[in-house]
């Protein structure tokens, strides 16, 4: 009897283990299922080290700065936590097919968009350069979808951030060291991430080769996933059953049909004569009784036009001094914009101006032209830098002196230099149709194009880049 009891207990233990294995295999392998097993793989542990190191330092300094920078940092932190959850999922599950993979990546993608949108909604922020540095580089979180070279993609995003972090350094290096430390902490996130990818995910996110296939998101620790929609509606009723008939019925029907066809013209003898009182077109009473009868296809009718799309809300035009920043925004078809009474510590930010002309008198610290079209800018003296970004067909004229003009992501830019600004440095990137006009003794200008095409060669020790001369 004791042997029988021991045998039953052993069988119960075996069944329990089998049920546990079965439950683990059927688990819906999403973010939420991974939380309890975090840190079981080396690359999840390494990512945790990144979160505890540069990310924690970035969050700490952002909190000290406060305001928009702190809010932005919290959004970035959410994106990194979503990425960690995906890494845990990948360490336990096999990679799903295309559509299912998109579902898994959707929360990260939406969080990236939220970070970018925050910057666009706060263009008037005093910490706009901080927000821009984050917004331009947050796309680096998308490395999980990049193959076979996710590392270089992150580096490219890091380089994009440096365009704005350099501004932060220039503005705060002698004013507040906290902002300098913020730049170092933020950029170190992406440099550390590059090293992490190189070690664990060189050719793309490393998925498990065993375990269940990862499915759509469900059960995020913070609540329902951002990317999941409402449950699908219940399926409709099944189609009515197709009437069935026996083989003998089909055979009989076919035989009857062929018999009628073989009758030839004699088949018309079975037709009944239709008298005039039975014809609709000859019997008005019958026509009124039966209503409109249409034979043949419906006549062509033009499709209804789509409802007009709502017109985008037009932002109000601005020309105002906010603190130490002149804001010139959303000006259209205005040819006499003027900024006077400037001070050395003031800056000018010109955004989304179209077919307009602005003159800035006096000496100012810096000027930024962002997302403008057909803008004419005339200024006296700038002690820092004039930057033209994301613009098209811009003309800039220097009346006094400026040390540096930067042209970035711009198509069509004419720079008219004065005699006092001939030593100006012109830095360009990702731009085209740039021309510098040099004054002559007669008061005219000679036009010189800025090179756009380059040739790079390996000389045995390093890459050597030269301007490509095109004979015309």
From Swiss-Prot:
Residues where Phosphotyrosine is found: 31
Positions of post-translational N6-acetyllysine modification: 81
A GO MF label: actin binding
Major site of localization recorded for this protein: membrane
SMART domains listed in its UniProt record: CARP (SM00673)
Sequence positions bearing N6-methyllysine: 287
Classification via SUPFAM superfamilies: C-terminal domain of adenylylcyclase associated protein (SSF69340), N-terminal domain of adenylylcyclase associated protein, CAP (SSF101278)
Location of the protein in the cell: Cell membrane
Keyword Acetylation: yes
Residue stretches of biased makeup (Pro residues): 229-243
Modified-residue entries (N-acetylalanine), positions: 2
Gene Ontology biological process terms in this record: actin filament organization; cAMP-mediated signaling; cell morphogenesis
Name of the molecule in the record: Adenylyl cyclase-associated protein 1
């Amino acid at each position: 009897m004791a042997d029988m009891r021991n045998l039953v207990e052993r069988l119960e233990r075996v069944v329990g283990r089998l049920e546990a294995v079965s439950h683990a295999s059927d688990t819906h392998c999403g973010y939420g299922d991974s939380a309890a097993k975090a840190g079981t793989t080396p690359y999840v542990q390494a990512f945790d080290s990144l979160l505890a190191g540069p990310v924690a330092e970035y969050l700490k300094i952002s909190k000290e700065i406060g305001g928009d920078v702190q809010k932005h940092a919290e959004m970035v932190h959410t994106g990194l936590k979503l990425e960690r959850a995906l890494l845990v999922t990948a360490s336990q599950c096999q990679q799903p097919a295309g559509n299912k993979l998109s579902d898994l990546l959707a929360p990260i993608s939406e969080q990236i968009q939220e970070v970018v949108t925050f910057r666009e909604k706060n263009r008037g922020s005093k910490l706009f350069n901080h927000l821009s540095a984050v917004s331009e580089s947050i796309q680096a979180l998308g490395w999980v979808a990049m193959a076979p070279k996710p590392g270089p993609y992150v580096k490219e995003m890091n380089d994009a951030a440096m365009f704005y972090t350099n501004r932060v350094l220039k503005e705060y290096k002698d004013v507040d060291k906290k902002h300098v430390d913020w730049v170092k902490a933020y950029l170190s996130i992406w440099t550390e991430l590059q090293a992490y990818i190189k070690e664990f995910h060189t050719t793309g996110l490393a998925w498990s080769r065993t375990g269940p296939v990862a499915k759509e998101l469900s059960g995020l620790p913070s609540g329902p996933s951002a990317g999941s929609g409402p449950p699908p509606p219940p399926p409709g009723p099944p189609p009515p059953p197709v009437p069935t008939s026996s083989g003998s019925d089909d055979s009989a029907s076919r035989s009857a049909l062929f018999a009628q066809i073989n009758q030839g013209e004699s088949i018309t003898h079975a037709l009944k004569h239709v008298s005039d009182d039975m014809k609709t077109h000859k019997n008005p009473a019958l026509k009124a009784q039966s209503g409109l009868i249409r034979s043949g296809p419906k006549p062509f009718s033009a499709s209804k036009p789509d409802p007009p799309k709502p017109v985008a809300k037009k932002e109000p035009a601005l020309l105002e001094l906010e603190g130490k920043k002149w804001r010139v925004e959303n000006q259209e078809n205005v040819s006499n914009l003027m900024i006077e009474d400037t001070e050395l510590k003031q800056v000018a930010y010109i955004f989304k101006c179209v077919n307009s002309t602005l003159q800035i008198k006096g000496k100012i610290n810096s000027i930024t032209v962002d997302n403008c079209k057909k803008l004419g800018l005339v200024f006296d003296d700038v002690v820092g830098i004039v930057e033209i970004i994301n613009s098209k067909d811009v003309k800039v004229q220097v009346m006094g002196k400026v040390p540096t003009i930067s042209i970035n992501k711009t198509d069509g830019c004419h720079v008219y230099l004065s005699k006092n600004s001939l030593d100006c440095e012109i830095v360009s990137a990702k731009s085209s149709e740039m021309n510098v006009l040099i004054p002559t003794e007669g008061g005219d200008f000679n036009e010189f194009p800025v090179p756009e095409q380059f040739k790079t060669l390996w000389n045995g020790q390093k890459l050597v880049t030269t301007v490509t001369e095109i004979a015309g």
